Regions:
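Glycine- and aromatic-enriched membrane alpha-helices
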Residues: 1-413
Length: 413
């Protein structure tokens, strides 16, 4: 039965999640060199438009309409045909259109996360085409497998409350693959890349934290106790990760940094995303405290071993954070909190949820790697992915967009 309170709540949560993509633009934009800030923020802006058009035309239908082999949907809701004001099959107290809009914001933020790995060296048109194809090949199937009716990963007993697999692991792994393919930025081994605008970084992180309440609490799909539970676990995990990252910096560097604190709060949110509506409140303390050292030292190790240039650590934050979050859900999940989970977690004496979580993570990684390689192969048929050395040296703001984030005016502007 339709519920006005649930509908209002979900519309607000949808707007919250939308707010995350501009927040990501500020977060990433502040981290890059000033000659690439327009390009970095423009990538998020372009995805905001592209994702809405693709989702409403065919993305939603492929992710949530019908079922083919537990992997993909069909075209029954092409251009939202048959999607109206009445409740749909996935939420019985809100209009079907509201559910579509809420999920659309997930389809927006997810590919935007990838852009942090390739800043300063990928052609804008190549990135645009890559994101379009990636959404089709990776995101829509992942959304169906986890959340769609008859989805394969849901069938094996895996749970993902708000997008550990669908959003963070898929985008993080894809970001790493793309970064390895593109190669390092010019002078990467010699130069020290400075964060050009620290206030932007903190502003973006704060916008992300604000929007994440809609992201996680809204995944309850109604204004109830589960939404409140997800709200609190998200707050706690983020806060603990922030403080733990600061502590690591104090121990290793002698002083905390605002960039580090901002990074910590974001990875705390990443880690709690899959389990926000499944784990007890006390477990969110553990999840948040542990994700910071896990991500901090994994990033250092990976950069030493792989020599990869994941510029803004998209894999280190979202890939590793999402993997830990998925495993933690298998450790601490409880059916008494959310009956969508078929079994309790490993710490409560049942190994089945934990095994399902590990299997789903492995499958997600495989889908992301293979899908990203396919996307790269298709895009390179039409355009080189990497900019020319001269364009990279000048900066992508000027070479790709003809704009400067901080112009120097002579006379009146």
């Amino acid at each position: 039965m339709m519920n006005a309170g649930d509908t209002g709540f979900m519309l607000i949560c949808t707007a919250f999640v939308f707010f995350m993509t501009p927040g990501l633009a500020f977060f990433y934009g502040g981290l890059v060199r000033r000659k690439n800030v327009v390009n970095t923020m423009m990538a998020c802006g372009a995805i905001m438009g592209l994702s809405v058009v693709m989702w409403t035309l065919f993305g939603y239908s492929l992710a949530f309409g019908g079922n083919h082999g537990g992997i993909i949907g069909d075209f029954r809701w092409f251009a939202l045909n048959g999607v109206g004001w009445e409740p749909g099959p996935y939420a019985d107290t809100i209009p079907h259109l509201v559910f579509v809009a809420f999920q659309m914001m997930f389809a927006m933020i997810t590919p935007a996360l990838i852009t942090g790995a390739v800043v300063g060296r990928m052609r804008f048109k190549a990135l645009f085409f890559f994101i379009a194809i990636w959404s089709l090949i990776v995101y829509y199937p992942m959304a169906h497998m986890v959340w769609g009716d008859g989805g394969f990963l849901a069938t094996i007993g895996s749970v993902d409350f708000a997008g550990g697999n669908v959003v963070h692991i898929s985008s993080g792994v894809s970001a790493l693959v793309l970064a390895i393919y593109l190669g390092q930025r010019r002078g990467y081994a010699k130069a020290t890349y400075r964060t050009h605008n620290i206030p932007f970084v903190f502003l973006g992180a704060a916008m992300l934290w604000f929007g994440w309440f809609g992201f996680n609490a809204g995944s309850a799909l109604k204004a109830d106790g589960l939404a409140a539970h997800a709200f609190m676990t998200s707050s706690i995990s983020s806060a603990c990760a922030l403080l733990t990252w600061m502590l690591i910096e104090v121990i290793r560097e002698g002083k905390p940094t605002l960039v580090g604190a901002s990074t910590g709060l974001v990875i705390g949110l990443v880690a709690i995303t899959p389990g926000a509506g499944f784990v007890p409140v006390w477990a969110s303390f553990i999840i948040g405290i542990l994700v910071s050292p896990i991500c901090y030292f994994t990033v250092i190790l990976l950069k030493q071993k792989l020599k990869s240039d994941d510029a803004l650590d998209a894999f280190g934050c979202h890939g590793i954070g999402g993997i830990w979050g998925g495993i933690a859900t298998g450790l601490f999940g409880k059916t008494s909190i959310n009956s969508v989970a078929k079994w309790d977690g490993l710490v409560f004496g049942d190994h089945r949820l934990f095994l399902a979580q590990v299997l789903s993570i492995v499958i997600t990684i495989a889908v992301a790697i293979v899908g990203t390689l396919i996307c790269i192969g298709i895009v390179r048929i039409f355009t080189p992915l990497r900019v020319d050395p001269k364009e990279e040296l000048v900066g992508l703001d000027a070479s790709q967009h003809g704009e400067n984030a901080y112009p120097s005016f002579n006379g009146f502007d």
